[in-house]
Regions:
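ABC family nucleotide-binding domain
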Residues: 1-188
Length: 188
């Protein structure tokens, strides 16, 4: 599903990624562990080209996505990414956050996107928060909404960048439970 070959990433003279090779099969779960500043987030951001690698190749679903001709926005539709600080739009309701991308990218009409969002909210026990704004949610709720927002695009793979690091210890379990369910269902 994802193949990384001789991946390098530098910021000026600082080489953060030094020749990474990795092969991730469909349904496989990979955890990248290392100290702060070791390049974990940079690696994840390179996988969907939020960061442009200095050199090397990344293949996703049989396509070389580091090829300049690749429509990376099209590729990203199949890669969900959840960040450590939620990145929800504060001016939109929970429902608006979840349905924005599927509607804007014309993957679903508004009615379909709303139905899909409500189904996903049911799944994580937060349907009652559909009309709430992010400022009204706990950290754990915000992160579960961020996961659902990515799932609303029906991705083939989910990338999680320290999804529990910004949470209070008592909120971590809520988010990990959603991640365990995804793993059990075979999400890569």
């Amino acid at each position: 599903m994802i193949k990384v070959s001789d991946l390098h990433k530098s910021f000026g003279k600082l080489e953060v990624l030094k020749g990474i090779d990795e092969n991730i099969e469909k349904g496989e779960k990979i955890v990248v562990i290392g100290p702060s500043g070791s390049g974990k987030s940079t690696f994840l951001r390179c996988l969907n080209l939020l960061e442009t690698p200095t050199s090397g190749q990344i293949w996703f679903d049989g396509q070389c996505i580091t090829d300049k001709k690749t429509d990376i926005n099209r590729v990203r539709r199949s890669m969900g990414m959840v960040f450590q600080h939620f990145n929800l739009f504060n001016n939109k309701t929970v429902l608006g956050n979840i349905t924005l991308a599927p509607i804007q990218l014309k993957l679903m009409n508004k009615e379909e996107a709303n139905e899909n969002a409500l189904r996903l909210l049911d799944r994580i026990g937060l349907r009652d928060k559909a009309d709430a704004y992010p400022s009204m949610l706990s950290g754990g709720q915000k992160q579960r909404i961020a996961i659902v927002r990515s799932l609303a695009m029906n991705p083939k793979v989910m990338l999680f960048d320290e999804p529990t690091s910004a949470l209070d210890p008592e909120m971590v379990g809520e988010v990990l439970e959603v991640m365990k369910e995804l793993a059990h269902e075979g999400m890569t």
